[in-house]
Amino acid sequence: MDQLLYRPKEAAKVLNMSRDKLYDLIRAGRITSVKDGRARFITADAMIAYVRQLEAEAAEAA
């Protein structure tokens, strides 16, 4: 990931999910987002943290 900020559509593509699913995760507090004016962005760090959280949950379930 070379970019620091991703628009929701871009972040959803990187995470291989729909934009609606991404917004559900943002509302649930599982992925953080930032706003610059009216524009919403997801940071690269937030996406990495989400993937690490998924890995930790999978390890606990195993």
Predicted regions: what they are:
Residues 45-62:
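A short, Lys/Arg-enriched interface patch at domain edges and termini
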Residues 1-20, 52-53:
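Polyanion-binding surface elements
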Residues 8, 41-42:
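Short amphipathic alpha-helical segments
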